[in-house]
Amino acid sequence: MHSSVYLVALVVLEAAVCVAQPRGRILGGQEAMAHARPYMASVQVNGTHVCGGTLVDEQWVLSAAHCMDGVTKDEVVQVLLGAHSLSSPEPYKHLYDVQSVVLHPGSRPDSVEDDLMLFKLSHNASLGPHVRPLPLQREDREVKPGTLCDVAGWGVVTHAGRRPDVLQQLTVSIMDRNTCNLRTYHDGAITKNMMCAESNRRDTCRGDSGGPLVCGDAVEAVVTWGSRVCGNRRKPGVFTRVATYVPWIENVLSGNVSVNVTA
């Protein structure tokens, strides 16, 4: 990868960012089986959940770059692993400080392209049955329309904005990209690096940004954006495909990249 990677040390999110943006947004789902998704991460600012993430290595969590929009360095960003409930004591739950955040060099606040980032934890996660990385999808292929995939998160579960305390899960059906690009849907905005899932009253919602779309046993994509009104069938959920970015991710994880460091 020849582009520089921008690394921001100990940066944080403002909770309002993921709440107010029409991006990444589980509505119409159900409570997930406790600890059945040991890769799930909760990105937290000052102790409040703001975005989801996926543990992809013992010290790295993959999420969405737009979760960084409007950040300030005066707040505290942490990553919670091993959790089902955000508030109840659980034996496998641990809150990790963040050493650094690496934004994809192509990501921008005014664009939905290249919407990925990586959190480097302050130290390696304690791995086991309840905390375990999920493999990346490495095959750069189109997921067949109608394929059922899994999303999970702690995002809002009602249009009124109610947030759950326990992890929610939803099975979604993959939509053909050409259909998703019709004028009646996303009107040409879906690039080859994105994919869509049907969202008729069942959708990711605010606070689910950055979480994984899991097809089979791998991270297929990352929750990115959709409609301001979650569950709008005319605005399918949009995800950033992971396979295209595997070389960048692996370069970041291995340290084989040129980085710019700012405070």
Curated annotation (Swiss-Prot):
CFD is activated by the removal of 5 residues at the N-terminus, named activation peptide, by the MASP-3 isoform of MASP1. Its EC number is 3.4.21.46. Residues 21-25 form a propeptide. Circulates in plasma in a mature but self-inhibited form. Activated by factor B (CFB), which displaces the self-inhibition loop. Associates with CFB complexed with complement C3b. Its main location: secreted. Residues 1-20 form the signal peptide. One of its GO terms (molecular function) is endopeptidase activity. This is Complement factor D. It comes from Rattus norvegicus. The gene is Cfd.
